[in-house]
Amino acid sequence: MEGNKKMNKTWNLKEMKKLIPLALPVLVVNLSIVGMGAVDAIVAGRAGVTDMAAVALGSSVYLPVALFACGVLMIIGPVIANMRGKSHESRVGYMTNHGLWLALMLSLVSMPVIYVLRNVFGWISDDAAMCRMASAYMFAIMWGLPANLGFVALKSLNEGSNMTRPAMYVGLCGLLLNIPLNYMFVFGMYGFPRMGGAGCGAATAVIFYIEFLLMFLLVYFNPKHRPYRRHIISWRRPTPSVITHLVRLGVPIGVSQLCEVMLFCAAALVLAPLGETQVASHQIAGNVGGLVFMLPLSVGLAASIRVAYHHGRNDLAGTRSAILSSYVLVLTICLCTFGGITLFREQIVHLYNDSELIVSTASVLLVLAAAYQLPDCLQVLSVGVLRGFRDTASITFITFFSYWMVGFPA
């Protein structure tokens, strides 16, 4: 009996050692994405209040469409991990190629949607200058969507192959390039025209293509991908049944992401009439909560890969070990973040604003945000585990019911 307990503990420790190195680079990638948004806000703010508001408004309309498309592609990683678990390595390149085709198809659908949505700003604001700038921002960033989705497809190949560091390196390069490119396009440096806030969209679009090119080169010249390299870059017509299979599994993930991001957009609109103090306090709490959320989100993605791999091998003990290790890691993260935010809530708010009214209001909201971390961490991890089992339909129903039938009315 003691020997079995020791064996289970050993297996859990081994699984934890595989889970953490898989999750850490994903965390860096997620933080680099958040960092790019912060750089956009800072540079646009230097250009003017109108530019900063236009970037915020444009991104709030662009992001739901982009996140839905990216969510559909997120299933590629678990599918590839499952294939590797079944020792179907020969089909990995074939599936990646279909992922790239799906990325192209999603781009052809999403870009016209973004183009049409550029015209909604006139309905929600009387500020003509801000609306024009927000529309120009969306038009600029729209052209980078195909590269962004292609990057996600190739990133999913690496994640499904237990290689998350390449995306980390590319994400950090994108973050570093975002600063000079923003200044070049926003302020019209080195011969480029001055675009104002719309320049943030142009800079992001350029970075998407750079990231896609870097990820493609890292995949193509990686010796581990050599056996199926020619399948990845094949221009052979995709098989409709494979595309349908990926869409059937991926669309529920995209819908669940859409439900979540749309709720937070709606919450911001509901808070607007309550005054700038409430809006600013909510923004601070949401920003801190969003940063902390990247921790369990990264573990959830790593868990989906490990669960899919063990499930593909029909390894029940390995699957159980991956799930248990993931929950232990996430619960540890929850306790640490709850304690840190609760103890240092006022110091955290002071990093954003020194107004006593905002400090007192936001400090209370931070305690609620810290308490919210526990169910939210468990939720995002459970979604990752279900994704590893390729059970995505239940994710959509649970997310829609929780966020819109319970959360929004409350």
Spans of model-derived segments:
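Short alpha-helical transmembrane segments in multi-pass integral membrane proteins
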Residues: M1-A23, I80-P146, F192-V251, V307-Y372
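N-terminal transmembrane alpha-helices
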Residues: T10-I42, R46-A47, S60-G71, I75-V79, ...
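Transmembrane helical elements of multi-pass membrane transporters/channels
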Residues: P21-D40, A140, G144, G174, ...
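Helix-terminus/linker motif at the lipid-water interface of multi-pass membrane proteins
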Residues: L31, G35-A53, F121-A128, M184-M195, ...
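Small-residue hotspots at the loop-to-helix junctions and early N-terminal turns
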Residues: V49-S60, A134, M138, G201, ...
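Small-residue-rich hydrophobic transmembrane alpha-helices
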Residues: M52-M111, Y115, N148-A167, A268, ...
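Transmembrane alpha-helical core residues of multi-pass small-molecule transporters
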Residues: S59-Y62, L106, C173-N178, A203-E211, ...
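Membrane-interface helix-loop junctions in multi-pass transport and translocation proteins
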Residues: R165, L175-L213, S360, A393, ...
